Amino acid sequence: DTTEFKYYELDANGALKVRKLYLDPFMDLYNLEIISFSISPTPSAESILSAQQQAIEKTADAKYRRTFHSDRGWGYQMRTYQYNLKVHNIFQSMSRRGNCLDNSPMENFFAILKQELYYGNTFHSYDELKMAIENYIMYYNTKRIKEKLNWLSPVDYRLATTAA
């Protein structure tokens, strides 16, 4: 799934301009860890495919059948996206038409990210917002605990369950 953020920059004439940034993350539903992501100034196939490739590489040694789930956005219906999954023996799952609940884990992550990082703050450049999102994802994965994960962070939960 892709989500949009806005930031505000002064143009060459000193006028305030609203700009946008797009985040394309991939989440492991086992522990809710963001395993890859890409950030771009425009919604693009390149951004989605970059995050997809990172997710493919990160899960390459998985001992279970990999399934990549997404909403029905244009980027996840691209032939290249689907081909990349097929070549790596990854099953594709897509939300049912008109059913946002099928993608609720990612939508929940977006809500948490925006509530804890974005709302109430003003960002004045692409780089400032990009760095804040990157730092937040690191925090979310390694420090932010979840009741659902026995009060562990996603990374700590993964490490605890794989060590057992």
What are these regions (language model features)?
Residues 1-164:
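Charged DNA-binding/catalytic regions of mobile-element recombinases
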